[in-house]
């Protein structure tokens, strides 16, 4: 999430930049969601086959399953931090199954300039399709918590740094408040 400095896109070696996490599967600023990569404990990237939000959700569920077994035996809690890249742009990069919003059906904000309307409709549809994909993945996480019998004893915190302009006032990302 690049909150600890200007380091972007590279390997984070074990140490203080991992902020105390014992298990690491991370990529900083990889926004090619169908050709993404991440790193574990060595500088060789691991390439993802498929949509990266699905893959990182799979990894988190695997981690939760492993930790739930350890926690039940040792009565120890665990923490998992999952930071999906979508709905960061590019908005059109996703599997066809997630492209569920029709650009022609998008209702634009009234402050989108007329010359930006076609592009804005495409961006809205992609943005909302990414959000739909994340909703499905959050549902998968919650189902895994229930399956593991730990949903009632788990705190799920959902937050986001997104909120792009999507052509409001002719602007694209979050350049202005």
Identify what each model region corresponds to.
Residues 1-2, 85:
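Alpha-helix/helix-capping structural signal
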Residues 3-13, 17-28, 162-168:
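C-terminal cap/loop subdomain of S1 sulfatases and analogous C-terminal strand-loop tails that border
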């Amino acid at each position: 999430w690049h909150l600890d400095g200007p380091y972007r896109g590279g390997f984070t070696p074990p140490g203080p930049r991992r902020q105390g996490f014992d298990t690491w599967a991370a990529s900083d600023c990889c926004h090619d969601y169908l050709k993404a990569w991440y790193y574990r404990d060595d500088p060789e990237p691991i390439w993802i086959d498929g949509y990266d939000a699905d893959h990182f959700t799979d990894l988190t569920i695997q981690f939760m399953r492993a930790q739930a077994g350890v926690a039940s035996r040792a009565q120890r809690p665990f923490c998992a931090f999952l930071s999906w890249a979508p709905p960061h742009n590019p908005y059109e990069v996703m599997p066809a199954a997630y492209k569920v919003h029709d650009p022609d059906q998008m209702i634009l904000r009234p402050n989108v300039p007329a010359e930006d309307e076609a592009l804005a409709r495409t961006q809205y549809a992609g943005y909302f399709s990414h959000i739909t994909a994340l909703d499905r993945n959050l549902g998968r996480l919650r189902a895994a918590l229930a399956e593991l019998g730990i949903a009632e004893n788990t705190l799920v915190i959902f937050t986001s740094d997104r909120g792009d302009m999507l052509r409001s006032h002719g602007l694209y990302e979050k350049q202005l408040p």
